[in-house]
């Protein structure tokens, strides 16, 4: 029964995170550069960092961390968008997207870590 309850929490959080990603990324996505994906990955990393470094565990970690943050961020879309940029001859933008996603995610995690340490 515990596994089923955990699955429900992850699923509910996942539905919420996916919907938020869809609308937020869609609202700020650009034709020439996948700004929407970069933004959700950075923000999602920050949010997951806050949860993790604040010591959130149990049901809240399943709902928000695994479910919502896990589905809000998207490594697969980032990867496909990077390859598409490369395929279309935008090699510099592909490199910028690859480096930018990693850098922004790490900055988000770092900011979260710093905030939790201060508070």
From Swiss-Prot:
Q: What is its main location?
A: membrane
Q: Briefly describe activity regulation.
A: Na(+) is not transported, but it plays an essential structural role and its presence is essential for fluoride channel function.
Please give the InterPro entries that the UniProt record associates with this protein.
Answer: FluC (IPR003691)
Which gene is annotated as encoding this protein in its UniProt record? Answer: fluC2
UniProt GO cellular component terms: plasma membrane
Recorded superkingdom: Archaea
- Biological process GO terms, please? cellular detoxification of fluoride
**What does it do?**
Fluoride-specific ion channel. Important for reducing fluoride concentration in the cell, thus reducing its toxicity.
* MF (Gene Ontology): fluoride channel activity; metal ion binding
By sequence similarity, the record places it as follows: Belongs to the fluoride channel Fluc/FEX (TC 1.A.43) family.
Task: Write the record's keywords in alphabetical order, separated by commas.
Answer: Cell membrane, Ion channel, Ion transport, Membrane, Metal-binding, Sodium, Transmembrane, Transmembrane helix, Transport
Recorded topology in the membrane: Multi-pass membrane protein
Which residue spans traverse the membrane?
46-66, 96-116
Provide the binding site for Na(+): 70, 73
Subcellular location, record wording: Cell membrane
What is the protein name stated in its UniProt record? Fluoride-specific ion channel FluC 2
């Amino acid at each position: 029964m515990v596994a089923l309850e955990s699955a429900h929490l992850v699923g509910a959080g996942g539905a919420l995170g996916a919907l938020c990603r869809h609308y937020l990324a869609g609202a700020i996505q650009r034709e020439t550069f996948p700004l929407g994906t970069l933004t959700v990955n950075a923000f999602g990393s920050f949010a997951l960092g806050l949860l993790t470094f604040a010591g959130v565990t149990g049901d809240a970690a399943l709902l928000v961390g695994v479910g919502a943050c896990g589905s809000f961020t998207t490594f697969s879309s980032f990867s496909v968008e990077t390859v598409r940029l490369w395929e279309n001859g935008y090699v510099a933008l592909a490199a910028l997207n690859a480096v930018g996603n990693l850098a922004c995610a790490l900055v988000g995690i770092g900011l979260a870590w710093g905030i939790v340490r201060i508070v």
